[in-house]
């Protein structure tokens, strides 16, 4: 999977967080988190609380998103992500993905290593 597609998959999952069941979007986002990121933000229950907390709750059930490439190499990519949340407020994030170089079934997969704190960008109206 292309690195941008990893970001898009995660955002689309969060956009429909409770489909097909409660918190499936967060779980799918977790599955694409780099092992180093999982160590910092996990286990999964803690990750769920983090995403539902004040810093990242605007990602849950957001209305739309755009993903713009900032930097890409053969092992790392950074994207600017803008989301319109369910309250019609825009937020910007820096989303970093890296190619996993650890042995195992995720070897050579692009996985999220970091997501910045959101930057409020104002209302859509």
Where are these regions (language model features)?
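Proline-rich intrinsically disordered, low-complexity coils
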Residues: 3, 20, 35, 118-120
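Context-gated lysine
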Residues: 4, 16, 22, 48, ...
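Residue-level signal for functionally critical sites in structured catalytic/ligand-binding pockets
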Residues: 10, 15, 25, 79-81
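Detector for Asparagine
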Residues: 12, 17, 36-37, 65, ...
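Exposed beta-sheet edge and beta->alpha loop/turn motif
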Residues: 69-125
């Amino acid at each position: 999977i292309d690195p941008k597609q990893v970001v898009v998959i995660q955002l689309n999952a969060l956009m429909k967080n409770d489909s097909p069941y409660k918190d499936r979007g967060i779980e799918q986002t977790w599955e694409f988190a780099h092992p180093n990121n999982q160590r910092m933000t996990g286990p999964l229950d803690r990750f769920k609380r983090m995403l539902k907390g004040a810093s990242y709750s605007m990602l849950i059930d957001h209305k739309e998103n755009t993903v713009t490439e900032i930097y890409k190499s053969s092992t790392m990519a950074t994207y600017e992500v803008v989301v319109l949340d369910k309250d019609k407020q825009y937020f910007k994030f820096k989303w970093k993905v890296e190619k996993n170089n650890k042995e195992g079934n995720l070897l050579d997969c692009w996985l999220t290593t970091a997501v910045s704190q959101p930057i409020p960008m104002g209302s859509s109206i």
